[in-house]
């Protein structure tokens, strides 16, 4: 008998790229879809392409060489086709899948920003932006020709892929902090409103990931069950806050289906023998078109979320500083509950936006000293793009409401 390697599922056999015929066949498939008119191809689990005895079989040098070969072949025949790297690995490794340079070692043009996703979820659980600030500050630089795919949720589980050293410098023991996050998002932590499920628990490494829809993870499901209006409002604010970050961060924002309506966990997968053993299906339910219709009814949860995100998307489209031109600058604040950064139009430095997000359940003070030193609040007042109102600094400080954000401009 012979063995096959199945990293993810028993029915998903890993390919043996040591066999040239396998690589040629894969390139043929890529070019087939390019010839059909596909503009972007998502390459799944690229970090696991190459297997080597005695190694973790992740992020091997040969995996990068394979991607470079695929990209080179595509560049010759279909240069307009872009690759998305789905590499859910440590922050320092993800950026490597863009390639070492833009000419000789080109790999993928787009990569999932899994690090930002994990850091945002940390901020939701801890109610502060301590690790989020440190993690964003230490995100590796990307190539000019490349961009991030920024997301809050996707079809997969949530992996807590922040950097261990960043966690330590934030005052956490990495293993204990990940356990706290799993407990929080699965509702085991006292006071947590989250309704997630543990996925892929590994007793050897202690690694556990999280399944669940965005709405259920931020407490909307529990709030609706208890008919607690304050909790419903907090959950909606959190959903909008998270999306305000991915829409303003720089890159391509990805919205997962159902999130703009507050779709909850669904247990329909338990009735399917092919799905019941994979709880990721809890957030992969059939789209609820009846729920979608409620977005047209004023005051419904669906309408409140949908209208807020629709407005943010419209603003994103017309705000030139949000273009991804390596023009983001993280600003240090004295308040650990806030994430503050600036975005500047590279063609007009006077056109800029100050993004400030409050991840705490209480209103927070932003001292405008640092923003002022970067050219903001020169007249003690700025306009919030989202509300259209003026935000006035009093005693050199601005108050940001609970679980809220500002997109401020002159």
Q: Which residues does each PLM region occupy?
A:
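Active-site and adjacent substrate-binding regions of carbohydrate-active enzymes
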Residues: 1-410
């Amino acid at each position: 008998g012979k063995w096959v390697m199945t990293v993810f599922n028993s029915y998903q056999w890993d390919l043996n790229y040591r066999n040239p015929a396998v690589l040629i066949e894969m390139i043929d498939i890529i070019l087939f879809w390019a010839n059909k008119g596909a503009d972007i191809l998502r390459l799944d689990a690229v970090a696991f392409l190459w297997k080597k005895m005695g190694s973790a079989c992740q992020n091997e040098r040969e995996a990068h060489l394979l991607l470079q070969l695929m990209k080179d072949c595509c560049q010759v025949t279909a240069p307009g086709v872009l690759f998305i790297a789905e590499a859910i690995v440590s922050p320092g490794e993800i950026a490597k899948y863009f390639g070492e340079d833009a000419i000789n070692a080109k790999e993928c043009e787009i990569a999932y920003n899994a690090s930002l996703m994990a850091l945002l979820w940390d901020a939701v659980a801890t109610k502060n932006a301590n690790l989020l600030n440190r993690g964003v500050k230490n995100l590796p630089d990307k190539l000019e020709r490349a961009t991030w795919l920024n997301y809050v949720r996707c079809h997969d589980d949530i992996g807590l892929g922040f950097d261990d050293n960043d966690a330590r410098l934030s005052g956490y023991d990495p293993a204990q902090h990940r356990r706290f996050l799993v407990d929080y998002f699965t509702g085991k932590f006292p006071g947590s409103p989250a309704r997630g499920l543990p996925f892929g628990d590994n007793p050897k490494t202690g690694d556990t990931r999280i399944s669940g829809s965005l709405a259920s993870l931020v407490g909307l499901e529990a709030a609706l069950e208890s008919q607690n209006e304050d909790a419903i409002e907090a959950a909606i604010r959190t959903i909008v806050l998270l999306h305000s970050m991915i829409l303003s961060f720089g890159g391509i924002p990805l919205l997962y289906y159902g999130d703009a309506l507050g779709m909850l966990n669904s247990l329909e997968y338990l009735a399917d023998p092919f799905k019941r053993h994979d709880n990721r299906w809890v957030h992969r339910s059939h789209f609820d078109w009846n729920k979608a219709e409620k977005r047209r009814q004023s005051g419904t949860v669906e309408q409140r979320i949908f209208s807020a995100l629709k407005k943010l998307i419209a603003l994103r489209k017309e705000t030139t500083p949000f273009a991804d031109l390596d023009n983001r600058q993280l600003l240090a604040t004295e308040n650990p509950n806030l994430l503050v950064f600036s975005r500047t139009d590279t063609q007009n430095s006077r056109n800029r936006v100050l993004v400030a997000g409050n991840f705490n359940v209480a209103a927070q003070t932003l001292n405008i000293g640092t923003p002022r030193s970067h050219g903001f609040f020169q007249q003690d007042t700025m306009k919030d793009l989202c509300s259209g109102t003026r935000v006035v600094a009093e005693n050199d400080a601005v108050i940001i409401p609970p679980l809220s954000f500002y997109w401020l401009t002159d």
